[in-house]
Amino acid sequence: AQTPVKVTVTGAAGQIGYALLFRI
């Protein structure tokens, strides 16, 4: 983790992706 922004973006994308994966 170099920048907290990247961590936030990755975390948000992971959360959304996981939610979508469970939705389907």
UniProtKB/Swiss-Prot annotation:
EC numbers, comma separated: 1.1.1.37
Entry keywords, A to Z: NAD, Oxidoreductase, Tricarboxylic acid cycle
Domain of life: Bacteria
GO terms assigned for molecular function: L-malate dehydrogenase (NAD+) activity
First-tier enzyme category under EC: oxidoreductase
Catalysed conversion reaction: (S)-malate + NAD(+) = oxaloacetate + NADH + H(+)
Residues binding NAD(+): G11, A12, A13, G14, Q15, I16, G17
GO biological process: tricarboxylic acid cycle
UniProt-listed Gene3D superfamilies: NAD(P)-binding Rossmann-like Domain
Signal sequence annotation: none
Keyword Oxidoreductase among record annotations: yes
Function: Catalyzes the reversible oxidation of malate to oxaloacetate.
Family to which this protein belongs: Belongs to the LDH/MDH superfamily. MDH type 2 family.
Protein name: Malate dehydrogenase
Organism: Planomonospora venezuelensis
